[in-house]
Amino acid sequence: MADGERSPLLLDGRDGMTGLSLGDEPYRPISKPQNFAVFPSAPPMLGEAPPPYSPLGSPESSSAPVISCRVCQSLISVEGKIHQHVVKCGVCNEATPIKNAPAGKKYVRCPCNCLLICKVTSQRIACPRPYCKRVINLGPVNPGAGSPNPQPTGARVSCGHCAKTFLWTEFTDRTLARCPHCRKVSSIGQRYPRKRSLICFLLCLIFVITTAGLIAGTWLKAQKYKGIYASWVFFIVLVLVTLVRALHWACMKISEPLHNYS
């Protein structure tokens, strides 16, 4: 068994140092190329989307997700970089998006391969690289099926003041709308103002009972201690404020929704 382990792995007719037989030509190393190929410039890519993840493994880990570089098509490992929007290629040093652009933004790639980010509504953008400084015309933004801006959703509302129609989209539990025509505030529906009016009336009733009890209980002492009158005034002011607020909500104009809009 030991003799078998010491036996040479190559045949006797080959040189032990070079692994070549006597009749083979001597090995000549391949000369290193003088210049590497320059990556070609690409036309501007408007609204560039991130490439899909490749099921192949990266050189560092056989299970790490990778994507293809949008410039040189090299594989880029995104392990530990999922939270980023773009990653940098280690071959061409250019950025490649791995996530969609933030809301209201889009990716644009300059012909010099620089990845830019701008507003969706932008029509012109300049490359920041000192040797490029190219101005890219993106053209007018036409809303269509592929537009990242969603169409407005909401309801058409008839103003309770001027009876004109306007679009309102912010529907919450406290829905107050300002008409763009008459600039007056009204409530969308009757539920919210009725609820507020009822609360203010109940507070007003509580303050009325409290004020009446305070005045009746301190009537004689107030003639001796003048500071008690200040507490009377305070509670009377609370009664008036809650009463005014209750009347305000009770008399608020109501704007009725006409139909849903999408």
UniProtKB/Swiss-Prot annotation:
One biological process GO term for this chain? phosphatidylinositol dephosphorylation
One GO cellular component from the entry? lysosomal membrane
Give the Pfam families listed for this entry. Tmemb_55A
**Short motif CX5R motif, span:** 118-124
The residues annotated as the active site are C118
Domain of life of the organism in this record? Eukaryota
The Gene Ontology terms for molecular function here are: phosphatidylinositol-4,5-bisphosphate 4-phosphatase activity
This enzyme catalyses: a 1,2-diacyl-sn-glycero-3-phospho-(1D-myo-inositol-4,5-bisphosphate) + H2O = a 1,2-diacyl-sn-glycero-3-phospho-(1D-myo-inositol-5-phosphate) + phosphate
**Topology term for the membrane:** Multi-pass membrane protein
Tell me the keywords, alphabetical order: Endosome, Hydrolase, Lysosome, Membrane, Transmembrane, Transmembrane helix
Q: Where are the transmembrane segments?
A: 198-218, 227-247
Broad enzyme group: hydrolase
Region annotated Disordered, chain positions: 1-25
Q: What does this protein do?
A: Catalyzes the hydrolysis of the 4-position phosphate of phosphatidylinositol 4,5-bisphosphate.
Q: What is this protein called?
A: Type I phosphatidylinositol 4,5-bisphosphate 4-phosphatase-B
